[in-house]
Amino acid sequence: LGGISLLVGGVGIVTIMTIAVAERTGEIGLLVALGAPRRTILLLFLGEAVALSALGGFLGLLLGFGLAQAIHFALPALPVHTPISFVLLAEAVAIAIGLAAGVLPARRAARLDPVEALRTE
């Protein structure tokens, strides 16, 4: 179940980033035409993908922690403990998924021809 959730999250990030590249084609073309290195464009979109996944991981951790506390409140005999190592590992996995999912759209954005990109607007 967890693997399927990670896969769906990764596909969601790829989709969101692909749409972002398509919507910002003109901006990307302008940046490249003004001399921005392709590496900068790549890092811009990779950073956005990582930020999205880190935020999603953090919100998921908050939701999980809140649900665990609600269960502990309803069933006090049930011990609820979340080790910090699990929290850090979960956030690291979320960031890694975001980084992996952002590579394709970021490479596509970095490889855009500035003339064609500016022509689309």
Model-assigned labels for residue ranges:
Residues A77-L88:
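Membrane-water interface of transmembrane alpha-helices in multipass transporters/channels
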Residues L1-A20, T25-H72, F86-A101, P105:
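Transmembrane alpha-helical interface segments in multi-pass membrane proteins
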